[in-house]
Amino acid sequence: MVKKLKVRIKEKPVTEKKIDTEFIRLDAFLKLCAAVVTGGHAKFVIQDGEVKVNGEVCTSRGKKLRPGDTAEFEHKIYKVI
């Protein structure tokens, strides 16, 4: 007899941050969201490939994020609004 298992996938929490400009650089956005403490820390985690932008690994700290874009770091998702 085969038993069926029900699996629940826990959704990652999404934190929304409003910007007042056309875009924001990825490193500045991580600081704005308090995902990192300093710009230096942001630089290292981005260069090490620990950050995803819109679901894809991004190693460019100067990446421009616009409203609707998401950044994922340490199992948390941050959305630009």
Language-model-detected regions and their locations in the chain:
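Short, structured beta-strand/loop micro-motifs enriched in basic residues and often containing a Trp
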Residues: 49-56
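Short beta-strand/loop turn elements enriched in aromatics
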Residues: 32-45
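Ferredoxin-like alpha/beta domains used as RNA- or RNAP-binding modules
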Residues: 1-33, 57-81
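Residue-level recognition of conserved structural "scaffold" positions that shape functional pockets
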Residues: 46-47, 62
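Residues that recognize and position ribonucleotide moieties
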Residues: 22, 44, 51
